[in-house]
From Swiss-Prot:
Cofactor(s) this protein requires: Mg(2+)
Record carries keyword Transmembrane helix: no
Gene of this entry: glnA
Broad class of the protein's primary localization: cytoplasm
Name this protein carries in UniProt: Glutamine synthetase
Organism: Rhizobium meliloti (strain 1021) (Ensifer meliloti)
Lineage of producing organism: Bacteria, Pseudomonadati, Pseudomonadota, Alphaproteobacteria, Hyphomicrobiales
Length: 469
């Protein structure tokens, strides 16, 4: 375990000029305040740094705005993007009066979920492996004014540029719709950029594995190694930061929106989960696909609470433009070995250590701390209450006849439905005080503001369909 003194030693050895204290707001956005190194000492690590939390959506009101950033020495790493030597440290949020963890701090919630797992006796570690996809565009323009609403995206990879005149000529070699998975360059035009992203991630302490082009034009994925829940939530925040920064350095712009382009695949964030105890995997056994009974119950919990989970795993109105049949979107609440059309998949693996559940409906707009914690709580509720998921569905669920299809439950169809589902189904989250009602209520209120704005704003497609009626 890295101590404050060890971090202070690293600061001297690396001639660090600034320390960037970072934390995550309820929406999942990384925030920061930069400290001059002269202010960084043992007292800062012991007492934390006061800041005004009233400007953070979903947090305290202006009359009780003081909060404490408490640096976590374990998370210290160098930021290669700044001109001045800068160390980054992730922080927890504390209440200055009680000194306790602030109940609406997402990272604090994730820590409580890990502690709840240990206290349950079911396991001592949950490993999480997220697979976040993203788009990179050459140019993006959007406007959401009352009299000017719309957007325009551009990338040299888009099929719409087949006949575009470029100064150096149009060289062709671009992926077709749903054809980006995964030809070599020059069809894949972003090999070097993704390699740079992976290199920087490794330099910042993230264990990397691979990268590749994704199904849609201008869509990509980086592969990082699984880790414990809080650590990999931290790493997912680093992942998104690096993707944005490297794309920017290449003169491009990256987005984790699930569905920026109609008619092509959207970006998901499949999440692999496995529980271990005393250094041994608990999900391996003699049941279906080599799973243990507790793993099946875990899946049962995910399926039972999926609609409530959607509020955290798919927390944007745009999320539900991805969660529609026909675009490899896992909308059907079923489980299967290897079958990618099911929302819960059991990846193939003969080694007991490889036994895990892949939850396929999350997307990268999720706050990783809240989403990972919520999925763990749903799975633990399944184990505690022995919620068997029923028979596995090994056929292609997309090709089922309508009569059979109607029998399979689905994920939510909108953010409004997800928030309403969370409001009704929350007891599994508040078990052990991991989440609490105040936190859930404030999250619903925060996200319902987005729903209302989206539902009340006229859409360009409506003009296309109705203007001349």
């Amino acid at each position: 375990m890295t101590t404050a003194n060890e971090v202070l030693k690293q600061i001297k050895e690396n001639d660090v000029k600034f320390v960037d204290l970072r934390f995550t707001d309820p929406k999942g956005k990384l925030q920061h305040v930069t400290m001059d190194v002269v202010c960084v000492d043992e007292d800062m690590f012991a007492d934390g740094v006061m800041f005004d939390g009233s400007s953070i959506g979903g947090w305290k009101a202006i009359n009780e705005s003081d909060m404490v950033l408490m640096p976590d020495p374990e998370t210290a790493h160098m930021d290669p993007f700044f001109a001045q030597s800068t160390m980054v440290i992730f922080c927890d949020i504390l209440d200055p009066v009680s000194g306790e963890a602030y109940n609406r701090d997402p990272r604090g919630t994730a820590k409580k979920a890990e502690a709840y797992l240990k206290a349950s006796g079911i396991g001592d570690t949950v490993f999480v492996g997220p697979e976040a996809e993203f788009f990179v565009f050459d140019d993006v323009k959007y406007k959401a004014d009352p009299y000017n609403t719309g957007f325009k995206l551009d990338s040299s990879e888009l099929p719409s540029n087949d006949d575009t005149d470029y100064e150096t000529g149009n060289l062709g070699h671009r992926p077709r719709v749903k054809g980006g998975y995964f030809p070599v360059p020059p069809v894949d035009s972003s090999q070097d950029m993704r390699s740079e992203m992976l290199t920087v991630l490794s330099e910042m302490g993230v264990t990397v594995e691979k990268h590749h082009h994704e199904v849609a034009a201008a869509q990509h994925e980086l592969g990082v190694k699984f880790d414990a829940l809080v650590r990999n939530a931290d790493k997912m925040q680093i992942y998104k930061y690096v993707v944005h920064q490297v794309a920017n350095a290449y003169g491009k712009t990256a987005t984790f929106m699930p569905k920026p382009i109609f008619g092509d695949n959207g970006s998901g964030m499949h999440v692999h989960l496995s529980i271990w105890k005393d250094g041994k995997p608990t999900f391996a056994g003699d049941e279906y696909a080599g799973l243990s009974e507790s793993c099946l119950y875990f899946i049962g919990g995910i399926i039972k609470h999926a609609k409530a989970l959607n509020a955290f795993t798919n927390p944007s109105t745009n999320s539900y433009k991805r969660l529609v049949p026909g675009y490899e979107a896992p909308v059907l609440l079923a489980y299967s070995a290897r079958n990618r059309s099911a929302s819960c998949r059991i990846p193939f693996g003969t080694n007991p250590k490889a036994k895990r559940v892949e939850v396929r409906f999350p997307d990268p707009t999720a706050n990783p701390y809240l989403a990972f914690a919520a999925m763990l709580m749903a799975g633990l509720d399944g184990i505690k209450n022995k919620l068997h998921p029923g028979k596995a569905m090994d056929k292609d669920l997309y090709d089922l006849p309508p009569k059979e299809l109607k029998k399979i439950p689905t994920v939510c169809g909108s953010l409004r439905e997800a928030l309403e589902s969370l409001d009704k189904d929350r007891k599994f989250l508040t078990a052990g005080g991991v989440f609490d009602d105040d936190q859930i209520d404030s999250f619903i209120e925060l996200k319902m503001q987005e729903v209302m704005r989206f539902e009340m704003t006229p859409h360009p497609v409506e003009f296309d369909m109705y203007y001349s009626v």
